[in-house]
């Protein structure tokens, strides 16, 4: 088993994006294990066959060991929920034997090799990529971006 694991966190509404992420990740890193942390259940009548997906494994929110799960879920909207499970999923993969773990948002397409990230993890315990590096100056951008950063943080 590869010691490099990559995961994303999403609901079924984002499954199409997760597929693009998985397909493009596997194109550049076929030896990485790609995981989906799934925050909800399949809709009625939906058929989901893992062996036909570019995903090596799925961990459902119920498998993360979150205490009082139903009340915890109730406190979050779907975006917050997909964000809130990242820490527990990271711990699960590391405790499961992963040497290195990369998280990618589900709406990402990998367009080039990510080996530099893996190499940086040789010397660093964690790497963070902020949503913003340069302050916005236009009013609309400030409202859309700066206010969101104040509300949710630049790392989510």
List the model feature ranges, each with a label.
Residues 1-156:
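Glycosyltransferase catalytic domains, chiefly GT-A lineage
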């Amino acid at each position: 088993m590869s010691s490099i694991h990559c995961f994303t966190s999403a609901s079924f509404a984002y499954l199409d994006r997760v597929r693009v992420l998985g397909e493009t990740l596997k194109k550049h890193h076929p030896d990485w294990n790609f995981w989906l942390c799934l925050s909800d259940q399949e809709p009625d009548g939906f058929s989901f066959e893992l062996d036909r997906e570019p995903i090596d494994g799925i961990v459902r929110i119920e498998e993360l060991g979150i205490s009082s799960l139903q009340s915890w879920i109730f406190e979050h909207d779907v975006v917050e929920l997909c964000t809130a499970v990242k820490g527990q999923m990271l711990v699960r993969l590391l405790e499961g034997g992963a040497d290195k773990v990369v998280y990618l948002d589900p709406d990402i397409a990998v367009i080039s090799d990510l080996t530099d990230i893996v190499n940086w993890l040789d010397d660093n315990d964690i790497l963070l990529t902020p949503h913003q590096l340069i302050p916005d100056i236009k009013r609309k951008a400030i409202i859309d971006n700066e206010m969101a950063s104040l509300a949710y943080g630049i790392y989510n």
